[in-house]
């Protein structure tokens, strides 16, 4: 199966190729950025498909904890060392961390050069590689330093997932479930009826294509996250705080989003937007892939105060992304603090169910 989707916004128009990685031809210098693990698995395969006058490789450490300014400076140092100019190209070969960093580095190098995404994790393929959001972390939180910089193209090769560990695969499934809960009830039902598996490339590729199509439609309508695109942050408002509190060492991003979705669902239930049956159905689907659905909150008020650093918050009003049934979502900045604290307090117990 091979499919090409398109992102078309006011500032960009680029293809998303879903299928076996084609040959990539470029007339100028190329800097490919990856990490040791991904490079060991896929670098040779990818380099054989790049046709360019000069191709250089930059290897950065693996892990969310390295998505910082130090790594960006190293990528830029590689670019300067190899004399990349404004017509040069960067390629991100890896998961969401690599994609975020290369997107950011290419966006600020000489005021911006082209880059291409070749995502190698399910999470990056269905979400992080599409849409042009880039960023790095700092001590205050996740992705607080960044910019919108759309790639020149995205190449999604589902066969690269054959080497993906089970836990990484599950983290990506969380983002697929997110898309279904927010925008497509029929897709959610399909995910309930069938099992996503690396061993079933046909259904997996269809699920990837469906998720990317949803993301593309949202980005085309709202490139800079001024409206509906904020709905894609379902699970992330809570999840980013969990990642920060655990210093990006306890949960994969998709796992933190899974917990965040459950917290958002609990808040939706409290506000009467979601039934208990719907909440339980979402949790059950997440748990099918061994995704966490609970996080022990030691201090609900301390957790609440961290919402003030969320990028969606404006004028000290916290924007929550809350499901209204399955297939619909609401952006709310009027949720009473007491209701949020009640939900957070419920996660201070042994079970969030």
From Swiss-Prot:
SUPFAM superfamilies: Dehydroquinate synthase-like (SSF56796). Its main location: cytoplasm. Keywords: Amino-acid biosynthesis, Aromatic amino acid biosynthesis, Cobalt, Cytoplasm, Lyase, Metal-binding, NAD, Nucleotide-binding, Zinc. Zn(2+) binds at residues 175, 236, 253. Pfam families: DHQ_synthase, DHQS_C. Belongs to the sugar phosphate cyclases superfamily. Dehydroquinate synthase family. PANTHER family: 3-DEHYDROQUINATE SYNTHASE, 3-DEHYDROQUINATE SYNTHASE, CHLOROPLASTIC. This is 3-dehydroquinate synthase. It comes from Helicobacter hepaticus (strain ATCC 51449 / 3B1). The lineage of its organism: Bacteria, Pseudomonadati, Campylobacterota, Epsilonproteobacteria, Campylobacterales.
């Amino acid at each position: 199966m091979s499919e090409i989707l398109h992102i078309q916004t006011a500032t960009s128009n680029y293809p998303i190729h879903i299928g076996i990685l084609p040959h990539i031809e470029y007339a100028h210098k190329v800097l490919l950025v990856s990490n040791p693990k991904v490079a060991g698995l896929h670098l040779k395969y990818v380099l054989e498909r790049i046709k360019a006058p000069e191709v250089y490789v930059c290897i950065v450490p693996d892990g969310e904890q390295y998505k910082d300014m130090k790594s960006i400076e190293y990528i830029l140092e590689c670019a300067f060392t190899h004399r990349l100019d404004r017509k040069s190209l960067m390629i991100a070969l890896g998961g969401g961390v690599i994609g975020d960093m290369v997107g950011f580095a290419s966006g600020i190098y000489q005021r911006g050069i082209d880059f291409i995404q070749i995502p190698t994790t399910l999470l990056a393929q269905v979400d992080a590689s599409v849409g042009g959001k880039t960023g790095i972390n700092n001590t205050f939180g996740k992705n607080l330093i960044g910019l919108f910089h759309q790639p020149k193209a995205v190449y999604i090769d589902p066969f690269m997932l054959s080497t993906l560990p089970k836990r990484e695969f599950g983290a990506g499934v969380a983002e697929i479930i997110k898309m279904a809960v927010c925008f497509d009830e029929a897709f959610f039902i399909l995910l309930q009826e069938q099992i996503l598996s690396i061993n079933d490339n046909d259904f997996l590729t269809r699920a990837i294509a469906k998720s990317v199509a949803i993301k593309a439609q949202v980005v085309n309508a709202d490139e800079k996250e001024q409206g509906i695109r904020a709905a894609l942050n379902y699970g992330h408002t809570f999840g980013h705080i969990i990642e920060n509190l655990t210093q990006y060492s306890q949960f994969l991003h998709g796992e933190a989003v899974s917990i965040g979705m459950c917290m958002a669902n609990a808040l939706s239930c409290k506000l009467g937007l979601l039934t208990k049956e719907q909440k339980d159905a979402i949790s059950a689907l997440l748990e099918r892939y061994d995704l966490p659905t609970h996080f022990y909150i030691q201090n609900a008020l301390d957790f609440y105060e961290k919402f003030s650093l969320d990028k969606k918050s404006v004028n000290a009003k916290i924007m929550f992304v809350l499901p209204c049934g399955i297939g619909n979502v609401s952006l709310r900045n009027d949720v009473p603090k007491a209701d949020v604290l009640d939900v957070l307090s419920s996660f201070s117990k042994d079970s969030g169910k």
